[in-house]
């Protein structure tokens, strides 16, 4: 009887600890009120959550969560983490000539663009961690040369989705004074308002919508093949890619995505592109529906009809299991 009581108390204690842990502000907040009603009216929201265009299992057929967790903790290739400090070059973002077009990649999925006089930041993660538990997914040495103090005020912050390696609580709070407008998917604004961002700077859209910005800049919101969630509840907001049209450039801003027909559709509707920025580095045989394999990235670039493509989500933190040589 005493043993049973101890087991019950331990389980109860774990539940309480988990509940308290999940109440931290960094986990954000589920959509509610008018935002939730708008979500429910989305053609992409079915059965209580946003859906991909194609059937998209989280894990490849024949595997399960136990298989994935086992490989994550015990099956990573020795090449998944560099043995030495990675080389980098730090560009001074505060002194850039305003008429110069620039792309600066910070590792993983974070990058800065200055295009036709506008400054743009995409999915910044500068805290050194891509996880709610800091020590589990830390940045590689040499990839964290920038801090939030290195950034000028910028016109547009793009957030493709709310995963920890794309929407970093610590980073966006520190950058708050620098941000003029935030462009993101429907539902993600709930996190940002919960973190005291002014709703008037938020532009939240569903797939296949158009945003008219200043000085000849336009954004078309386009699909990806992925999922979202910062805690237990999944797919309460929509994951995005974006078509950015400027006076002289057309750029595809790709979020995390498995390969699918949406790339060809986007290419047919909006191509050709001057530049497509595509993920390539989070690939794994168990994740093939939600992250592209290297050869699929090339096909996506072809589908998009892009003149140039830049691959991102390269090594910054040890999330991938397969050898980096596959790149």
Regions found by a protein language model. Give the residues of each.
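Cap/insert and terminal regions of metallo-dependent hydrolase folds
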Residues: 3-40, 45, 156, 181-190, ...
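Metallo-beta-lactamase
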Residues: 2-137, 184-253, 274-280
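Acidic/histidine-rich helix-loop elements
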Residues: 126-143, 227-233, 284-290
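Catalytic core of the metallo-beta-lactamase
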Residues: 111-114, 212-273, 288, 292-296
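Active-site metal-binding motif and surrounding structural segment of the metallo-beta-lactamase
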Residues: 136-183, 271-277
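Active-site metal-binding loops of divalent metal-dependent hydrolases
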Residues: 124-126, 162, 224-225, 255-257, ...
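Divalent metal-coordination and catalytic microenvironments
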Residues: 113, 123, 161, 168, ...
């Amino acid at each position: 009887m005493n043993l049973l009581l101890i087991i019950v108390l331990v389980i109860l204690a774990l539940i309480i600890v988990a509940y308290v842990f999940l109440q931290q502000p960094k986990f954000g907040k589920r959509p509610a009120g008018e935002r939730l009603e708008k979500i429910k009216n989305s053609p992409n929201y079915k059965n209580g959550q946003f859906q991909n265009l194609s059937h998209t299992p989280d894990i490849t057929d024949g595997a399960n969560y136990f298989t994935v967790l086992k490989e994550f903790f015990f099956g990573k290739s020795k090449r998944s983490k560099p043995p030495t400090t990675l080389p980098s070059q730090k560009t001074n973002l505060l002194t850039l000539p305003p008429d110069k077009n620039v792309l600066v990649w910070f590792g993983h999925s974070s990058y800065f663009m200055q295009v036709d006089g506008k400054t743009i930041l995409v999915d910044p993660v500068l805290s050194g961690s891509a996880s709610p538990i800091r020590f589990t997914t830390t940045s590689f040495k040499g990839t964290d040369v920038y801090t939030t103090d290195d950034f000028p005020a910028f016109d547009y912050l793009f957030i493709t989705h709310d995963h920890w390696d794309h929407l970093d609580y610590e980073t966006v709070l520190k950058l708050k004074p620098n941000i003029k407008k935030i462009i993101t998917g429907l539902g993600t604004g709930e996190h940002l308002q919960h973190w005291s961002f002014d709703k008037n700077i938020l532009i939240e859209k569903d797939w296949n919508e158009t945003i008219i910005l200043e000085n000849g800049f336009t954004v078309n919101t386009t699909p990806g093949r992925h999922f979202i969630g910062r805690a237990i509840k999944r797919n309460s907001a929509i994951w995005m890619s974006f078509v950015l049209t400027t006076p002289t450039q057309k750029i595809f801003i790709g979020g995390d995505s498995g390969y699918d027909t949406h790339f060809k559709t986007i290419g047919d509707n909006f191509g050709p592109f001057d530049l497509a920025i595509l993920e390539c580095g989070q690939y794994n045989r168990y994740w093939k529906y939600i992250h592209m394999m290297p050869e699929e990235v090339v096909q996506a670039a072809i589908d998009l009809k892009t003149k140039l493509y830049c691959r991102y989500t390269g090594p910054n933190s040890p999330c991938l299991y397969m050898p980096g040589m596959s790149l």
